[in-house]
Structure formats: C-alpha cells, structure tokens
Amino acid sequence: MSYTLGILDQSPIIEGASNEQTLQKTVALAQRAEQLGYSRFWVSEHHDTKSLAGSSPEVLVSYLLAKTKSIQIGSGGVMLQHYSPYKVAENFHVLASLEPGRVDLGIGKAPGGLPLSTKALQYGTLNQGEDFEERLTFLQQLIEQTIPKKHELYGIQATPIPQTKPALFLLGASPESAALAGKLGIAFVFARFINSDNKVLAQAASTYRSHHPNGTFALSIAALAAPSKEEAKELIGDQKITKVHLASGRSLTLQSVELAEKFGQESGEEYTVEQYEADILYGTAEDIRANLDDYHVRFQIDEFILHTPILKEFERQRSFELLSPVHLQLQQKVKVI
C-alpha cells in the first residue's frame, strides 16, 4: 500500500503535569516520531483551555524544527480567521528559510476556542473573521507570489522569500471545505476525528478530486493500538464527541458538554448541545493497518495523520510506536505538495 503516516499532537495536559512538562513531552514525541519514520509531525491551536497546552503553533513549530533533523514539522493548524494572512505568510517564510523543505502550513477554519477567546484574539483590530475564503486565497497568493494586479495589495511580498515554499494544507471536515481546497489547488486534510461520517468523507474526497485530481487528500484519524484489541478498547473507554449547534447554522466540536454549553452562552444565540460516540480505530497494529489499507483503497487517501486521544502517557506513546512506519514496515515517501 502506498501511503504515509504522520502524527497530530495537541499537547494534552495529563493530570499532574505542568504546562512546561507537557510541551517538553511534545518535543520528545516529535523526536521519537522522526526516529520511527513518521513523515510529518503537526501541532494544534487551542485557546483558553486547561486541557491542551498548544495555543501558538507557529512558535512551537519553530522550536520543534530546531529540535529535529529531517521530519516535516507543521501546524495542524493556524486558525486563520484570527490573523493577518500577510503575517502568517511572513512567519512561515522565516521558518521555511531556516529549515528548507521541512515546513508545513496547515490552515484551520474553526475558532480554536470559545467566543470570548475569539474576541480577545481580534481585540483592537478591524478583523471580524468572516472572510475566510478571501483570507485563504490571499495567503496562498502571498506564498506562491501570485497576487493579481487588480488586488489592492499588488506588489507586496511576504519576505523573506524562501527557496522552498512551506507546504500549504487546508484542514476541514466537510465537502464544502474540500471543494475550497480543490478549487485553490492546495492539499486537503479531512478531520475524521471530528466528523466520522464516512458518507461525508466519501463526498469530500470525490468533491476534492473533481477539482484537483492530482492533489493530496489526507485523513486525520483517531486511532489507538495496543498488544490486544481488548486492551485497546478498554483504554478508549466511553469517549464522546460533543457538538454545539447554533441557531445561525454553525456547528462546532468542543471537548466537553460544559465547554459546549459555555460556547453557546457566549455566542448570544440559541443553541443545542449533542453528544455521540467517538469513532476511534482501535485494536492491534495489524487491525489498524488493515483499517488504514481499507480507507486508502476506498477513498484514495494519500496520507494518514494519526491522533490518539487518551491521557495515559505510556499507552499513548506505545500506540505511536506500534503504528509507526518502522513497525508496520511502510515505505515512507513524502509527496511533494
């Protein structure tokens, strides 16, 4: 089977660990991922939370690049609604100039926090965060140096211009996001750990391929491997996915019912909260390898980004070891984005 494996680490704060210890564990995991043959290591952006330590992926990416030698390091992702595309391009151009060919720029559409943190991130600016497609298009133009003459910022450059551009990805969980990535001709990562509906995944894959047949369609998927399927199932426990549905039509995934309720209250809209079973791949390494092979064939997945949502440090690390390209004897060849 011809696909590659990467890791998404949200820097989960295990009970009793400090923020400092948590971030050092992310560094250690990135270094181990490199040794195990993983193609990419991504970190996330979450704000005003006591459960995850990664709030500034661009800063963490720079540190991880300095602490590793060859693995691709990137954001999974930068929440572009909060920021100037120009500044994001500058940040990642600096990184790509320091570590040519190793920098991934994953862009997310979600807020990464509650309405209050969104307000804080946009405080003192004219930014309303409502023009995502325009922002993403401008960011792509800055990176590829293709700003059209009719644009009011024609002639601007996000310096320094690196010899090797950062690899640009859009992250999402809907056919609409896949269509946007396809139309822009950039790589797409479907977040199955957020939306586990395989019918939606199939539609997203088909939509993306219709716009960008030779593009990269990757899948970020929740998975846990253990020596036995019984142990893996026990480790997963009764995990839920929690969503808040706003009257405006927006739906967002939160980490708990309490946070979903808080999001709804801070939004000022009428809302409902829904919980359902988290669809996490679990079993032995061979079980999960069979699942990945199946997804690769059915949906033409080029790459899997593994997310392991448990708070037991040893068992989480062991899962990444068991699912590593070295252990599964996968030939890793990173596709040029």
Please provide the spans of the model-predicted regions:
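N-terminal beta1-alpha1-beta2 module of alpha/beta enzyme domains
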Residues: 1-68, 336
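Flexible, glycine-rich active-site loops centered on histidine and acidic residues
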Residues: 2, 7-19, 82-147
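An alpha-helical appendage that flanks or caps ligand/catalytic pockets
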Residues: 126-155, 199-299, 331-334
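A conserved active-site cap/scaffold subdomain adjacent to cofactor or substrate pockets
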Residues: 176-194
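Active-site mouth loops of central-metabolism enzymes
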Residues: 9-24, 78-85, 162-172, 276-285
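Conserved, mostly hydrophobic/aromatic
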Residues: 5, 37, 45, 64, ...
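Acidic (Asp/Glu)-rich catalytic clusters
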Residues: 61-69, 96-103, 180-183, 206-212, ...
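Structural preference for beta-strand elements that scaffold enzyme active sites
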Residues: 2-7, 40, 70-77, 102-106, ...
